[in-house]
UniProtKB/Swiss-Prot annotation:
Belongs to the bacterial ribosomal protein bL28 family. This is Large ribosomal subunit protein bL28. One of its GO terms (molecular function) is structural constituent of ribosome. It comes from Pseudomonas fluorescens (strain SBW25). Keywords: Ribonucleoprotein, Ribosomal protein. The gene is rpmB. Residues 1-20 are annotated as: Disordered.
Length: 77
């Protein structure tokens, strides 16, 4: 399973760790992903999604039904 948010599409990005002596080593910045069950009232069931914290805020703002319809239309689930 990939580390990608199903709502926003955010995935890992790369960058550098930089020490006090300005030595640079490569690293990955991972998104804050959570497995979360959302209750969908229209379907009378839970839907389990792998979403970032930002994705959860989007669902809170727009509603799970709207977001779920967009995800299904895009073929992500």
């Amino acid at each position: 399973m990939s580390r990608v948010c199903q709502v926003t599409g955010k995935g890992p990005v790369t960058g550098n760790n930089i020490s006090h002596a300005n030595n640079k080593t490569r690293r990955r910045f991972l998104p804050n992903l959570q497995h979360h069950r959302f209750w969908v009232e229209e379907e009378k069931r839970f839907v389990r999604l792998r979403v970032s914290a930002k994705g959860m805020r989007i669902i809170d703002k727009r509603g799970i039904t709207v977001v779920l319809a967009e995800i299904r239309a895009a073929g992500k689930i």
